[in-house]
């Protein structure tokens, strides 16, 4: 009888640990802004080390607490949805500018702004196919009526930065999602035509409504995003 009672007590402990672990685990799926999201998780866990993350990059979102994707910004200001789709309990839109990144010796480096039609003959360093930002930037080019001449494609912001700094081409650079300014050797120029902005859409699903930690992290991520600003000297304004 005693071994049976001990087994029951152990099972209760295991079930409690399982429930506690689930309540302290955030299931996060994202298709954009991987650098920003990774850095925000590291920063968040520095003060909340007991919170765990299960991270995925999938088109399907049924099993996640939070999903982050990007969309081209059409409206003047980020939308504020009054009605949410079924299964969604919260949605935030985080807007950022998309700049043109050029080497310091580029003829465009001293420009205060640039029209994409002016760079139609330039070589571009681009993100690889399949990335949402790549599709958004392709749409910017279509709106400007240009077809970028790609000399290199990479899925790494660091590679884009290094190749632009080396003078091999120009590229697009998001204001915040890649973790701020690119650093020495790259100049960022605001694009005046077409308007080049995107929204990061952060969605919290109904399955997470009883997990306060998910709502807390979503608040933290939104604040973290707003703090990511480009330093003067890195951008031509």
Where are these regions (language model features)?
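Alpha-helical "hinge/linker" immediately C-terminal to small N-terminal DNA-binding modules
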Residues: 1-17
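Central regulatory/effector-binding core of bacterial HTH transcription factors
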Residues: 23-81
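A late-sequence structural motif
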Residues: 36, 186-231
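Short beta-strand-to-loop elements that line the ligand-binding cleft
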Residues: 51-59, 127, 147-156
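Flexible hinge/capping segments at coil-to-helix
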Residues: 84-98, 102-124
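Beta-alpha-beta core module
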Residues: 84-91, 95-97, 158-207
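Secondary-structure junction motif
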Residues: 108-109, 122-144, 210-214, 228-233
């Amino acid at each position: 009888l005693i071994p049976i009672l001990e087994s029951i007590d152990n099972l209760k402990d295991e079930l409690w640990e399982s429930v506690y672990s689930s309540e302290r685990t955030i299931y996060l799926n994202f298709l954009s802004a991987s650098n920003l999201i990774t850095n925000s998780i590291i920063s968040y866990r520095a003060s909340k080390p007991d919170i765990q993350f299960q991270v995925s990059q999938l088109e399907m979102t049924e099993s996640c607490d939070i999903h982050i994707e990007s969309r081209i910004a059409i409206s003047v200001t980020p939308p504020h949805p009054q009605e949410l789709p079924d299964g969604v309990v919260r949605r935030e839109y985080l807007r950022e500018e998309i700049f043109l990144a050029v080497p310091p010796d580029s003829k465009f480096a001293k420009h205060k702004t640039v029209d994409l039609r002016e760079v139609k003959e330039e070589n571009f360093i681009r993100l690889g196919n399949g990335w949402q930002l790549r599709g958004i930037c392709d749409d910017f080019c279509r709106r400007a009526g240009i077809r970028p001449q790609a000399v290199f494609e990479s899925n790494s912001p660091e590679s884009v930065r290094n190749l632009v700094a080396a003078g091999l081409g120009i590229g697009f650079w998001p204001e915040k999602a890649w973790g701020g300014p690119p650093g020495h050797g790259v100049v960022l120029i605001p694009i005046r035509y077409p308007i080049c902005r995107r929204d990061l859409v952060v969605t919290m699903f109904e399955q997470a409504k009883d997990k306060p930690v998910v709502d807390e992290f979503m608040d933290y991520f939104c604040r973290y995003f707003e703090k990511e600003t480009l330093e003067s000297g890195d951008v031509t304004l």
